[in-house]
């Protein structure tokens, strides 16, 4: 079994606590946490848990397992961490953990990576102009990525991710929509083993434009793109009004619902089942999954 790498995200947030708590019953011998060992020790003391750290020299070092056991591939903090107090001086540390995990996955040393929540504002204040894991990993892997959140009932993909609302329309083009749909279609086949994925696309505007009265994006961009994708053999319907896209019959019929922007899709799936929803990045040559909550 290939190794699974975990990054804890923002050191002053809940990520280190989750890493410690995971060691009590979920971590197995093939799981490695990439972090500063002192961070895990600090967290264990804070939440009153006993842990045993196995600090690795490299990815091929011998691993241990058992309650409280954590295999740690060390990356040193830039500055001492204070729980609950975000510090941009540790932004570089956060970036290093993500980069290391991604590179080890790219090189085949690990089968996938699980990421803890980051503070995007702290990273930017620390000099790293990134808007999120999804975009950063796409840059590392030199490819386009698509954010998808899923649980047992729903798979919701986003065409745009961390983009201000007044800028979203700039990203709604025939080419970009086509790229997003093709990534979803490919990964549903290859990673989820769905032979003929069915995708439902929402419109951008209220009522999916209402025949152009409430916006032209649907008639000028989305509808022609859907027709072209259908002609290429991709099973996609839409655009449909976002307010009815998540009716039970649609959730049952379609494998994925593609929304145009962040807050068009995420509130639905988080309301449905926040605790069991995970974030998966499609389009990457590696496997990356994440929690769907913030740094707390």
Place the predicted regions along the sequence by residue.
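Flexible loop/hinge segments that line or gate small-molecule binding clefts
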Residues: 128-164, 286
């Amino acid at each position: 079994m290939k190794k699974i790498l975990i990054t804890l995200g923002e050191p002053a947030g809940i990520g280190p606590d989750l890493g410690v708590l995971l060691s009590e019953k979920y971590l197995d011998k093939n799981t490695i946490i990439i972090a500063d060992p002192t961070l895990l020790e600090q967290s264990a003391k804070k939440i009153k848990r006993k842990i045993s750290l196995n600090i690795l020299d490299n990815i091929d070092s011998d691993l241990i397992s058992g309650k409280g056991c954590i295999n740690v591939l060390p990356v040193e903090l830039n500055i001492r961490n204070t729980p609950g107090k975000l510090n941009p001086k540790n932004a570089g540390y956060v970036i290093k953990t993500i980069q290391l995990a991604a590179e080890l996955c790219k090189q085949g040393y690990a089968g996938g990576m699980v990421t803890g929540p980051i503070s995007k504002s702290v990273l930017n204040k620390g000099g790293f102009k990134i808007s999120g894991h999804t975009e950063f990993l796409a840059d590392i892997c030199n490819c386009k990525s698509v954010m998808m959140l899923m649980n047992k009932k729903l798979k919701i993909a986003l065409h745009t991710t961390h983009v201000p609302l007044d800028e979203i329309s700039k990203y709604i083009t025939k080419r970009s929509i086509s790229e997003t749909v093709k990534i979803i279609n490919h990964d549903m086949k290859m990673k989820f083993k769905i032979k003929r994925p069915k995708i439902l696309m929402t419109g951008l505007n209220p009522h999916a434009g209402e025949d152009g009265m409430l916006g032209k994006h649907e008639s000028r961009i989305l509808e022609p793109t859907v027709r072209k994708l259908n002609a290429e053999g991709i099973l996609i319907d839409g655009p449909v009004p976002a307010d009815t896209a998540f009716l039970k019959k649609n959730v049952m019929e379609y494998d994925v619902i593609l929304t145009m922007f962040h807050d068009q899709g995420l509130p639905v799936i988080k309301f449905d089942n926040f605790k069991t929803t995970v974030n998966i990045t499609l389009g990457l040559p590696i496997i990356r999954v994440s929690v769907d909550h913030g740094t707390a």
